[in-house]
Regions:
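Residues at a specific register/face of alpha-helical coiled-coils
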Residues: 1-4, 8-18, 22-50, 54-88, ...
Length: 179
């Protein structure tokens, strides 16, 4: 990404600097967050109900959204200067197109992160809703999850008891108990 916008200089707060240098901190932070997010997602692949990892993923996504928004703001702030440089012949058409692609890429990346965070929040709401349904069912029947171990299986019962069951697992439990 960073190599795409070489040779473009902009003025920020009265100082002339290369666009790459202006984005250096934001890009470094983005790379660090991406690496950490990949580690968390790898853990979640093996343990999808890990509450600590889910909380970390949500926090990292939020930080990544903030960071990407900051990058997009810097790119948008430089846009007029870059356009003027292109019109005056100070930068090539290639450089200008690369700058435009960088803005597009950053916008799409930001939208993807927001969707990912939204999907995560929707999953949390589904888990909360299914948990409430199970609690209502247990209180209405006067039974506990252990009473349904035969129908649910020990793995599902343990996931429900430890709070690591996914919304799909909770829906499955509701379906099995409701029979």
């Amino acid at each position: 990404m960073a190599g795409r916008i070489k040779g473009i200089t902009i003025e920020i707060a009265g100082e002339t600097t290369g666009l790459q240098n202006a984005l250096k901190d934001v890009n470094k932070r983005s790379n660090d967050l991406t690496k950490e997010l990949k580690d968390v997602e790898r853990l979640l692949k093996f343990d999808p109900g890990n509450v600590e990892a889910l909380a970390q993923k949500q926090q990292l996504l939020t930080q990544q959204i903030e960071n990407t928004t900051q990058k997009l703001d810097k790119l948008k702030a430089a846009e007029q200067q870059v356009q003027a440089q292109f019109q005056n012949g100070k930068i090539s058409e290639e450089q200008y197109r690369a700058f435009r692609r960088e803005i597009e890429f950053t916008e799409r990346s930001l939208n993807g992160l927001k969707n990912n965070l939204g999907n995560m929040k929707a999953e949390q709401e589904n888990v909360a809703s299914s948990t409430r349904q199970l609690e209502t069912l247990f209180s209405a029947t006067g039974k506990s999850v252990d009473d349904f171990a035969g129908a649910l299986g020990n793995r599902l019962v343990n996931a429900i008891k430890s709070g690591t069951a996914t919304s799909r697992q909770l829906d499955q439990a509701i379906g099995l108990i409701g029979r």
